[in-house]
């Protein structure tokens, strides 16, 4: 327990964005260029190790350094890694304008029905393995893939949510198609991987050409995968724990890793709203799509995406240079490592039933607060003296255990952050 003395609060303490993920791209002349990929489910960009943006030309299929032409990102005349971009006057860090990014995000959520999985009880998560027509079967055994989901002693998604929920939520993942855990088995789609990548006249003429086409292709893929394994799911397995008519959650583990700009094959949470797909009379709707390679299949990614299914939003800023870091490494919904830290106390209070009250400190004095890992007396609210729409939340973070040991810095201490209502 920590004792704190409040006299005056005037300061504010300060993603699951992927950043600098290695990716190899192949030029039309078969030259391999080693780049990096950064972004989230709404928008991704390719860049070099100095953050110079790289884009594929729609005319010849080569990758070039990028520049901005009014509101569009366009290729320069310089192929990637053929020149020093700084010497050519190319600006680093070119990315989609914020207004266009927000439009992509809004369109992504536009047709989704707002619903969240229950945050208390047992959720039997259905996980489906998927590969494409031009790919061989998964070679890694099922038991290796099972550990990030179900490893009893952690780290795993099941162990994480048991701990952060104070044993109120148990997420048990069941894998399909069924097979011996010493082997592996997947649904194989009728289309190859390029069918699910962006269109390019020269290098990928079968790719999707707009967001609507990408949505239909993704949802058709997942619909077919669910129908392929539907008969294997036992009727007595409770996949709708709150009896709302929807499967609580489904995850898809897709072979491979993202390969470039605007790739729909990127870890994300979405809803299968384009089709009516049912398992044992419950509709398949909310899902998390994950990739099995390239550093994208981690406990941190699984927990971030599943917390979306409980209703939690992303906390990171798309433009790091226009606003302070939201909460950074103090919350799994902003930034986390392969083994995630907890979400903040406020996120537990706002989006789950794990913290059910937010006591207010109205007067100066001495107050006691427990670490966030404790299930009681772990959060306070202090109203802003200058705003009716803002208040501060206080919590106590201790570097301990498997997850909280990954919080920033080397010490235990109070975390104070502002909530703008």
Predicted stretch roles:
Residues 33-34, 43-47, 74-75, 134-141, ...:
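Short, solvent-exposed loop/turn elements at domain surfaces
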Residues 14-115, 358-362, 385:
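N-terminal prosegments of processed precursors
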Residues 2-13:
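Sec-dependent N-terminal signal peptides
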Residues 18-20, 122, 411:
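Extracytoplasmic
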Residues 249-251, 255-409, 420:
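Extracellular hydrolytic enzyme modules, especially secreted metalloproteases
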Residues 40-41, 47-52, 56-59, 67-70, ...:
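Short, flexible beta-strand-to-coil junctions
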Residues 91-303, 309, 313-321, 413, ...:
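Propeptide-to-catalytic entry region of secreted or membrane-anchored zinc metalloproteases
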Residues 22-24, 34-36, 43-45, 53-56, ...:
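Ordered hydrophobic segments in well-structured contexts
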């Amino acid at each position: 327990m920590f004792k704190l003395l409040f006299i005056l609060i005037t300061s504010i303490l300060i993603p699951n964005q992927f950043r600098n993920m290695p990716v190899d791209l192949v030029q039309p002349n078969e030259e391999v260029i080693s780049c990096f990929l950064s972004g989230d489910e709404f928008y991704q960009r390719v860049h070099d190790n100095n953050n110079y943006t790289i884009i594929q030309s729609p005319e010849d299929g080569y990758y070039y350094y990028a520049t901005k032409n009014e509101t569009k990102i366009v290729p320069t005349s310089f192929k990637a890694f053929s020149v020093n971009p700084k010497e050519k006057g190319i600006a680093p860090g070119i990315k989609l304008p914020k207004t266009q990014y927000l439009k992509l995000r809004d369109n992504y959520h536009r047709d989704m029905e707002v619903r969240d999985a229950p945050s208390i009880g047992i959720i039997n998560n259905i996980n489906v393995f998927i590969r494409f027509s031009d790919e061989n079967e998964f070679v890694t055994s099922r038991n290796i893939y099972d550990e990030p989901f179900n490893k009893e002693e952690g780290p795993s998604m099941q162990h994480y949510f048991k701990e952060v929920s104070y044993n109120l939520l148990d997420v048990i993942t069941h894998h399909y198609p069924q097979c011996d855990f010493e082997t592996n088995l997947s649904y194989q789609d009728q289309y190859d991987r390029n069918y699910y990548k962006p269109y390019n006249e020269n290098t990928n003429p079968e790719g999707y050409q707009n967001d609507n086409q990408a949505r239909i292709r993704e949802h058709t893929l997942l619909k077919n995968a669910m129908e392929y394994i539907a008969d294997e799911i036992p009727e007595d397995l409770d996949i709708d724990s709150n009896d709302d008519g929807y499967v609580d959650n489904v995850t898809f583990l897709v072979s491979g890793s993202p390969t470039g700009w605007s790739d729909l094959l990127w870890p994300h949470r979405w809803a299968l709203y384009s089709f009516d797909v049912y398992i044992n009379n419950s509709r398949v709707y909310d899902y998390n799509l994950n990739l099995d390679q390239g550093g994208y299949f981690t406990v941190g990614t699984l927990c971030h995406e599943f917390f979306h299914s409980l209703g939690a939003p992303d906390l990171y800023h798309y433009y790091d240079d226009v606003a302070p870091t939201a909460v950074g490494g103090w919350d799994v919904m902003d930034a986390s490592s392969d083994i995630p830290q907890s979400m903040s106390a406020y996120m537990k209070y706002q989006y789950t039933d794990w913290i059910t009250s937010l006591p207010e400190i109205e007067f100066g004095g001495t107050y006691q607060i427990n670490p966030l890992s404790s299930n009681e007396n772990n959060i306070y609210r202090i109203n802003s003296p200058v705003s009716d729409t803002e208040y501060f939340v206080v919590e106590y973070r201790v570097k301990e255990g498997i997850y909280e040991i990954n919080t920033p810095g080397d010490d235990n201490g109070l975390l104070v952050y502002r909530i703008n209502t």
